[in-house]
Amino acid sequence: GKLADPDQLGNGEDAQAIIRETPAVAWMAYGIHGDELSSTDAALWVAYQLAAGQDEASRRIRENVVVCVDPLQNPDGRERALTLTRMFIGQVANPDMQSAHHTGTWPWGRGNHYFFDLNRDFFILSQPETRARVSALREWNPQLAVDSHEMEPWETYLFSPSREPLNPYLSPSYHKWIRIFAEDQARAFDRHGWSYYTREWLDNWYPGYTDWIAYAGAIMILYEQAGVAGTVVRRHDGVVWFHPFFPSL
């Protein structure tokens, strides 16, 4: 916490010493909308890879970064979404997005126990999950934060930075590093031939989103994966997508 509070720093040399001797902190958050099921599923793979991966990248992360994985930010919403899916799925999953097991009934799984959208609460702090999460984030003061979501199945993959106009209340350093991360991620997607887009509908003006942490100095990356509503969907182009774990729902 000393580096995050300038009042505790004596001079620039103190800050540089902390930077050299202290590992970076990354905060990986998943499942703030309970009906975006693949987000939490991905968190388990990320945690396993970081803990057990023997590749060079995983080893370097373990040696140099403290990674905090928050795998399920909205457990009540996820349980409600899974209950609706089990209720309406039938013997054979229907890929039509208008079928009942995709649309469900109110209250859907997006909100928490009180049906509140937790991804709108980060300056209001009206919900217990948000208050606990903000307390933990202020304790760890991550340099990198990731928020993972799902979007409609006919989309591809979205990641930061946001569309213009850019938020002038975020530091020039933030805008610089978010571009560096985006360019690196774009190259990785290009190597695999994966479709993606960026600088589109995403904005980072509203301080109630998870990316409020950018105001505290973190580089905040949003990931939006095309979803399959927990089971199987037929896209507009006729492609059928499956959730890899839906038979176990």
What role is predicted for each listed range?
Residues 127-129, 193, 227:
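Metal-centered catalytic cores of metalloenzymes
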Residues 1-6, 13-23, 42-46, 59-125, ...:
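Surface-exposed loop and adjacent secondary-structure segments within mature catalytic domains
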Residues 17-38:
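Short HxH-centered metal-ligating active-site micro-motif
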Residues 34-48:
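Metal-associated gating/positioning segment near the N- to mid-region
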Residues 131-155, 176-205:
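Active-site-adjacent substrate-binding region
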Residues 27, 143-147, 220:
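Short glycine-aspartate micro-motif
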Residues 29-36, 119-123, 171-175:
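Second-shell loop/turn segments in exported
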